[in-house]
Design a protein with these regions (language model features):
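Primarily a LysM-type cell-wall glycan-binding module
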Residues: 449-488, 493-510
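Membrane-lipid interaction segments
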Residues: 1-450, 455-458
């Protein structure tokens, strides 16, 4: 008799690979005439901004720019000054060849080294390298057996649950607003920001993200070397086209500022100055749709020899969403006990997921750079490394692997000098999600062979001495009888799959 096989498709977890690459940095920065000449280099930073990702068989191509920012001490008491340059790059990373119906690539990294020197008061030379770490995760639509019928077939069902990646979108957006200073600024040294997505509406094929970008500006007034700070809130409302997104899915949205531009404004009658501020930010949207599918984990026939071809696949599930804030504190001695802190910055290395004392923990290394003026009037940079560790709000099963799809941002940073030591307090916000992968063993193919030998008519009773932990389905397969008949013949409760204790089982005749 012909066996009927029913199949369906589920989004199995696909490739999981990591690639590393180096972005060389070699450039010269010319100091504009309206900026003070260089007296002393304080610190140089490099940060990549990835604008496009293109996946081809065996290759991932990244396009973007590397922002090189140099802080220096200006001549003739000009104080702390800043200049920057954007260096475009295209980088191809070699990957294993794999098929995918959906994929995501998370780009992280850290500065490997930077050598910065002033060739003359109007020219700065920078040499260095930035190390990229790219994690690629894919899903692949895979056909599975969901049911079998006829041919005396018995099957062991298992329900697989997970998420289908419905949308992965990265879009560069522009947010405009006003930044008001109490008096016209002589120099704007740095503008940073943190975003807050307050409302996310999703509909068929679209998403609407609303929120506020909190901006913090470090600036200096005319004739004053002291740094001042000014804040502003820029509301945003972005409509995103995301095919595959639906109202019943799970959706996360993160906005990361990548650049700011301030245009000269007008001075009002009270002496304040209003500046037009344009923020460039990377809007990241991830959407998943949950699914459940009943599959066949094992099978046999009560009438024919049965040959099974196993199938092993991994499912992907959303372990937890992240929107957690953690405070890191540290201190260390200052080379000059009388140094005065002027400004501070923080950067993060790659995020990883480890198990510590049985719990899954998100870890990263944060480096705080504090600019200070020593007792000789020279500006220097002091650094303090902090270890970031965030226990996940959900338990990770022992048989599961997980990977983070999240971003770290600075919510607050305070540096102070007290008693000859540098005290640092860094508030870190983690946004995104953690996905888990679990392996399942299924039946990939079934083939019926010759009919089984007829039962011995002289054997009227068969008894099986079952051991604790044995599966009822395995016992039934051993004797080529239906598991349902085994339940009925031994008065076992419906749904019994495994024996809790040793017992004698009556094996019904075929």
């Amino acid at each position: 008799m012909e066996l009927k096989v029913f199949r369906d498709v589920l989004p199995a977890a696909g490739a999981d690979c990591t690639a590393k690459a180096e972005l060389p940095l070699e450039t010269e920065l010319l100091i504009s005439d309206y900026l003070p000449p260089v007296q002393r280099i304080v610190k140089c930073f490099a940060k990549p901004v990835v604008l496009q990702k293109q996946l081809a068989p065996g290759r991932l191509t990244l396009e973007g720019y590397l922002r090189c920012t140099v802080y220096y001490q200006g001549e003739e008491g000009a104080g702390l000054c800043q200049t920057e340059q954007k260096l475009p790059f295209t980088k191809a990373l070699e990957l294993p060849s794999f098929a995918a119906t959906a994929w995501t690539a998370c780009v992280e990294g850290q500065t490997e080294y930077l050598n910065c020197r002033a060739v003359n008061p109007r020219r700065i030379e920078v040499r260095g390298a930035y190390g990229l770490v790219v994690s690629v995760h894919a899903q692949l639509s895979t056909e599975v057996i969901t049911a079998l019928s006829e041919g005396g077939i018995e099957q062991k069902p298992v329900t697989l649950a997970g998420v289908r990646r419905a949308a992965t979108l990265e879009k560069l957006v522009t947010i405009e607003g006003a930044l008001t200073f109490p008096k016209p600024p002589a120099a704007i040294l740095d503008i940073t920001g943190t975003a807050e997505v307050r409302e996310l509406k999703r509909m068929q094929g679209k998403a609407v993200a609303k929120g506020v970008l909190h901006v913090l500006c470090a600036w200096r007034a005319e004739g004053d070397a002291a740094l001042r700070s000014q804040t502003a809130d820029l509301p945003f409302n972005q409509i995103l086209d995301a095919d595959g997104l639906s109202e019943d899915g799970r959706c996360l949205c993160v906005l990361e500022p990548v650049g700011f531009a301030a245009a000269e404004g007008e001075t009002t009658e009270d002496g304040s100055a209003s500046t037009t501020l344009t923020a460039t930010a990377m809007l990241r949207l991830s959407g998943w749709r949950p699914y459940q599918l009943q599959c066949v984990a094992d099978a046999f026939s009560t009438r024919f020899e049965t040959t099974l071809t196993p199938q092993t696949l991994a499912t992907e599930s959303l372990l937890c969403a992240l929107d957690e804030t953690t405070v890191l504190r540290g201190s260390g001695p200052l080379p000059d006990a009388g140094a005065q802190i002027l400004a501070c910055f923080a950067s993060f290395g790659p995020v990883s997921l480890t198990r510590q004392e049985g719990r899954a923990v998100l870890t990263a290394r944060a480096v705080v750079s504090a600019f200070a003026e020593n007792t000789l009037g020279e500006m220097e940079c002091y650094e303090k490394a902090l270890d970031y560790a965030l226990p996940l709000p959900a338990d990770l099963p022992e048989d599961a692997d997980a990977y983070p799809e999240c971003w770290l941002s600075v919510q607050d940073l305070q540096c102070a000098s007290a008693g000859g030591a540098l005290d640092v307090s860094l508030t870190v916000r983690a946004e995104g999600a953690v996905l888990a992968r679990q392996t399942a063993s299924l039946v990939g193919a079934v083939e019926l062979g010759d009919p089984l030998a007829p039962a011995d008519p002289e054997v009227s009773l068969r008894i099986c001495y079952a051991q604790p932990g044995e599966e009822l389905f395995a016992i039934a397969r051993r004797y080529h009888v239906s598991p349902g008949q085994m339940l009925a013949a031994n008065d076992l409760p419906d749904g019994t799959a495994r024996l809790d204790e040793a017992r004698r089982l009556l094996v019904p005749g075929v």
